[in-house]
């Protein structure tokens, strides 16, 4: 897995995913975004929170697309994390690093998967959604 990240895909564009997107863009990283709610993805694109939108999940696992992505970040609700990871099984053990932002991991059991790094960036706010995106949300915070 390369340490040079140039293109990322964020799945889930609420406060956490959008904050990661904004922070990444400030570092010159190209950000692709997907959300189950097409309106959210469209707003994120219009507000320049993401550089490119992914309209359908099927495109994510398309080899022509995913092989150009360095890092996939899941910023979905905890109960959806495992389901999304399973949908990404075609890229398990590839050169693409997959991580998440979920606070709950006890239901996630993956054996012999070398490119999934579970994480919890202990961050949040009393606000939610795309409108609460903050590129400085993760500064000086602990990540476990």
Residue ranges and their predicted role:
Residues 1-57, 61-64:
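NAD(P)+-binding Rossmann beta1-loop-alpha1 motif at the extreme N-terminus of oxidoreductases
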Residues 65, 136-137:
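Structural alpha-helical scaffold elements that stabilize or flank donor/cofactor-binding regions
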Residues 4-7, 95, 140:
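Phosphate-coordination loops involved in phosphoryl transfer and adenosine-cofactor binding
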Residues 51, 70, 96:
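Conserved acidic residues
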Residues 82-131:
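Rossmann-like NAD(P)(H) cofactor-binding subdomain of soluble oxidoreductases
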Residues 8, 72, 98:
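Receiver (REC) domain switch-region micro-motif
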Residues 62-89:
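Rossmann-like NAD(P)-binding element
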Residues 142-144:
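Conserved small/polar residues in nucleotide/adenosyl-binding loops
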């Amino acid at each position: 897995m390369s340490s040079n990240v140039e293109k990322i895909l964020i799945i889930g564009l609420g406060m956490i995913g959008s904050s990661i997107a904004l922070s990444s863009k400030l570092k010159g990283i190209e950000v692709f975004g997907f959300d189950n709610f097409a309106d959210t993805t469209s707003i994120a694109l219009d507000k320049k929170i993401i550089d490119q939108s992914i309209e359908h999940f099927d495109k994510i696992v398309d080899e022509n697309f995913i092989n150009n992505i360095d890092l996939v970040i899941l910023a979905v609700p905890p109960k959806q994390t495992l389901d999304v990871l399973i949908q990404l099984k075609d890229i398990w053990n590839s050169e693409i690093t997959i991580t998440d932002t979920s606070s709950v991991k006890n239901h996630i059991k993956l054996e012999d998967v070398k490119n999934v790094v579970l994480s919890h960036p202990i961050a949040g706010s009393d606000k939610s959604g795309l409108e609460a995106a903050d590129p400085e949300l993760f500064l000086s915070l602990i990540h476990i």
